[in-house]
């Protein structure tokens, strides 16, 4: 076997292309959204999130891609032996894609983020209504980072002004830094064991 450091963004792109998938024997996506939230929280804090194990097996017939969309590769070149739930979570959130749950139904994972406090929460009505939250961080990942950040800051300024309050320069810097940190999770490096 060999070990390779790969960035989350590289792995997510391999999944999107269909180059990286699951062997047929793997279970469907079973993590509750709270575990996905905790995964993103650990990453933004710089905590390790484990390793991945991939198997290069071009001859394996019974393997499947992740997600519910069509892919460039008809069958994956590599399959995930260990780390399926983490990679599926990252792919679904960073690409805004639905996954199949244990009942084989399409499922959207909604994770909210508060850039002022740098905290994540499972998306629910409060985070949807409260404009200090990015309701679904998938929207940030599939948008242009600069324009997304500026739109968020402008909306937050308007919210504050409607309450007779001001968004300070210090708060703007905190928001900008934390949204940048959110985007930079795509550069988070994982150790990948290839067998």
Residue map of PLM features:
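Basic- and aromatic-enriched surface patches that contact anionic nucleotides/nucleic acids
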Residues: 1-195
């Amino acid at each position: 076997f060999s070990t390779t450091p790969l960035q989350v963004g590289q792995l997510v792109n391999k999944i999107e292309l269909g180059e990286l998938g699951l062997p047929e024997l793997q279970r469907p996506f079973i993590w509750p959204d709270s575990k996905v939230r905790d995964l993103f929280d650990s990453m933004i804090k710089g905590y390790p999130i484990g390793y991945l194990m991939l198997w290069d097996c071009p001859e394996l017939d019974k393997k499947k891609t992740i997600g519910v969309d069509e892919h460039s590769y008809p069958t994956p070149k590599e399959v995930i032996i260990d780390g399926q739930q983490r990679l599926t979570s990252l792919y679904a959130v960073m690409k805004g894609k639905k996954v199949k749950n244990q009942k084989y139904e399409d499922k959207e994972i909604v994770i909210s983020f508060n850039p002022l406090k740098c905290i994540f929460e499972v998306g629910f009505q409060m985070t949807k209504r409260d404009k200090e939250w990015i309701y679904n961080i998938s929207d940030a990942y599939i948008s242009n980072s600069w324009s997304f950040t500026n739109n968020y800051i402008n909306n937050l300024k308007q919210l504050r002004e409607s309450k007779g309050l001001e968004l300070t320069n210090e708060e703007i810097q905190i928001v900008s830094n934390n949204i940048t940190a959110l985007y930079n999770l795509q550069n988070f490096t994982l150790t990948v064991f290839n067998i």
